[in-house]
């Protein structure tokens, strides 16, 4: 059967059978709706994939922490299991030892997903490339083509929106939890107290350095161990707007002082008579104000080196990172501008997006967005609308980041939306954060942080259960 001949009954077309597309197709079929799942492999392969299996894991076999009480990704695992996720079922069935993490046998995992989708009576798998916009007669489409979206489809999407619709290269600076920054060292101020669009004149957190600290920092950047480009990234050159911080440092010892770390227009209120030799600035990253990104600090340093080097910055000695920096090839949408809360393209609502293309990072995150996209697409087909889960849940917090929780920029300049892993910094703060332990003693330091995460997780699981009961007629996963 050719995929371009629509079945007699209503159907949703899902383009891309990675983790997000596979999960979307599964959720649509579970809701009793027919699905045509389009996968271009093996008709056309990519530089990253090695097989023609659905949901092939190309970079890692780890789904990261499975601790639902203390870790945001573990919490997302738990929510997805409650929602009957195929990806989580296949991961659990093909788990390999990895301590507290959920790691899987790659081949077994992909085979399980492929078998489940191939055997479902409402799912038709078509091996073909969709090399442009889907035909107009496809009125309900989920596009989940991932970071290696083919050029013809990417060009067609951009033609529907504008030149800034798609990015093809991540340039991600580290993002720090606001409450882990030492405010006895750092201070709020914009350069020259400038009030930019949406700003107050005190929009940046500033961390000062002496000359000795700056010199040691530059040396550490240059000496730090770097990540190599993957084979399919090597033909994507740096451009000056996203040079890695260590590449700038290699161009001359004073380069950073005349770039992102310039100390001009700022006065340290903790020591107003001493002018810092260099200053690291952090800018608010989300509307909640819980996350701050390190301005101009995109990097190819390995994660261990980033933690070691960036914690030498005054005020960041105890920094907790929501995500570390990176620079790699990726295709993703300017989702806060382009997508509605149901992940539909505002310029063409028949098209819904899912997975890494929307601006999430990680296997589990991509699959979870596919899960919601599938549920929403199925609801649309029967004339209903599905509100996203509350922002207090892991899935709702991630959707909120993608569709509106991120701020574009404080000062006029290029867009700043970047992909994000799930982390507790995306969640609304607790109304009454825990202050005492079960023994009645006041919580301090790490104990307070652990209690806060556990309270956020407990709230999330209660709220996802309530959302499922109110909006879905899905059995809970066993």
Swiss-Prot record:
<dbReference type="InterPro" id="IPR020595">
    <property type="entry name" value="MnmG-rel_CS"/>
</dbReference>
<comment type="function">
    <text>Catalyzes the folate-dependent formation of 5-methyl-uridine at position 54 (M-5-U54) in all tRNAs.</text>
</comment>
<feature type="region of interest" description="Disordered">
    <location>
        <begin position="429"/>
        <end position="448"/>
    </location>
</feature>
<feature type="binding site">
    <location>
        <begin position="16"/>
        <end position="21"/>
    </location>
    <ligand>
        <name>FAD</name>
    </ligand>
</feature>
<keyword id="KW-0520">NAD</keyword>
<dbReference type="InterPro" id="IPR002218">
    <property type="entry name" value="MnmG-rel"/>
</dbReference>
<keyword id="KW-0819">tRNA processing</keyword>
<keyword id="KW-0274">FAD</keyword>
<keyword id="KW-0285">Flavoprotein</keyword>
<dbReference type="InterPro" id="IPR004417">
    <property type="entry name" value="TrmFO"/>
</dbReference>
<dbReference type="GO" id="GO:0050660">
    <property type="term" value="F:flavin adenine dinucleotide binding"/>
</dbReference>
<protein>
    <recommendedName>
        <fullName>Methylenetetrahydrofolate--tRNA-(uracil-5-)-methyltransferase TrmFO</fullName>
        <ecNumber>2.1.1.74</ecNumber>
    </recommendedName>
</protein>
<dbReference type="InterPro" id="IPR036188">
    <property type="entry name" value="FAD/NAD-bd_sf"/>
</dbReference>
<feature type="compositionally biased region" description="Basic and acidic residues">
    <location>
        <begin position="438"/>
        <end position="448"/>
    </location>
</feature>
<dbReference type="GO" id="GO:0002098">
    <property type="term" value="P:tRNA wobble uridine modification"/>
</dbReference>
<keyword id="KW-0963">Cytoplasm</keyword>
<comment type="similarity">
    <text>Belongs to the MnmG family. TrmFO subfamily.</text>
</comment>
<dbReference type="Pfam" id="PF01134">
    <property type="entry name" value="GIDA"/>
</dbReference>
<dbReference type="GO" id="GO:0047151">
    <property type="term" value="F:tRNA (uracil(54)-C5)-methyltransferase activity, 5,10-methylenetetrahydrofolate-dependent"/>
</dbReference>
<keyword id="KW-0808">Transferase</keyword>
<keyword id="KW-0489">Methyltransferase</keyword>
<dbReference type="GO" id="GO:0030488">
    <property type="term" value="P:tRNA methylation"/>
</dbReference>
<keyword id="KW-0521">NADP</keyword>
<dbReference type="GO" id="GO:0005829">
    <property type="term" value="C:cytosol"/>
</dbReference>
<dbReference type="InterPro" id="IPR040131">
    <property type="entry name" value="MnmG_N"/>
</dbReference>
């Amino acid at each position: 059967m050719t995929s371009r001949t629509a079945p007699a009954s209503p159907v949703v077309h899902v383009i891309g059978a990675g983790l997000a597309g596979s999960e979307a197709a599964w959720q649509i079929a579970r809701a009793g709706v027919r699905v045509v799942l389009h996968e271009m492999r093996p008709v056309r392969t990519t530089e990253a994939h090695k097989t023609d299996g659905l949901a092939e894991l190309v970079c890692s076999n780890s789904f990261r922490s499975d601790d639902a009480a203390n870790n945001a990704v573990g919490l997302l695992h738990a929510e997805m299991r409650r929602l009957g996720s195929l990806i989580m079922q296949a991961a659990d069935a093909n788990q390999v030892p990895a301590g507290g993490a959920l790691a899987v046998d790659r081949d077994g995992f992909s085979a399980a997903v492929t078998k489940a989708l191939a055997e479902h009576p409402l799912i038709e798998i078509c091996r073909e490339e969709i090399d442009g916009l889907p035909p107009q007669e496809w009125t309900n489409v989920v596009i989940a083509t991932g970071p290696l979206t083919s050029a013809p489809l990417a060009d067609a999407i951009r033609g529907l929106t504008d030149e800034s619709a798609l990015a093809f290269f991540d340039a991600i600076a580290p993002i720090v939890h606001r409450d882990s920054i030492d405010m006895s060292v750092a201070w709020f101020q914009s350069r020259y107290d400038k009030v930019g669009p949406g700003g107050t004149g005190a929009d940046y957190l500033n961390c000062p350095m002496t000359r000795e600290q700056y010199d040691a920092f530059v040396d550490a950047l240059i000496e730090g161990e770097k990540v190599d480009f993957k084979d399919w990234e090597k033909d994507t050159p740096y451009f000056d707007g996203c040079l890695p911080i260590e590449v700038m440092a290699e161009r001359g010892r004073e380069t950073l002082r005349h770039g992102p770390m310039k100390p001009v227009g700022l006065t340290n209120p903790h020591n107003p008579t001493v002018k810092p030799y260099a200053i690291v600035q952090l800018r608010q990253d989300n509307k909640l104000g819980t996350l701050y990104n390190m301005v101009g600090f995109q990097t190819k340093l390995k994660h261990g080196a980033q933690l070691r080097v960036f914690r030498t910055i005054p005020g960041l000695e105890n920094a907790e990172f929501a995500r570390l920096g990176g620079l790699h090839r990726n295709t993703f949408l300017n989702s806060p501008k382009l997508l509605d809360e149901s992940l539909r393209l505002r310029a063409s609502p028949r098209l819904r997006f899912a997975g890494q293309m929307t601006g999430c990072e990680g296997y589990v995150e991509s699959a979870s967005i596919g899960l919601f996209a599938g549920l929403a697409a199925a609801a649309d087909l029967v004339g209903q609308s599905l509100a996203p889960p509350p922002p207090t849940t892991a899935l709702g917090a991630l959707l909120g980041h993608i569709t509106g929780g991120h701020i574009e920029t404080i000062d006029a300049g290029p867009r700043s939306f970047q992909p994000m892993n799930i982390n507790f910094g995306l969640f609304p703060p607790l109304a009454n954060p825990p202050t005492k332990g079960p023994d009645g003693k006041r919580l301090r330091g790490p104990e307070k942080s652990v209690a806060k995460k556990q309270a956020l997780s407990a709230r999330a699981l209660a709220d996802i259960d309530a959302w499922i009961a109110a909006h879905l007629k899905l059995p809970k996963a066993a």
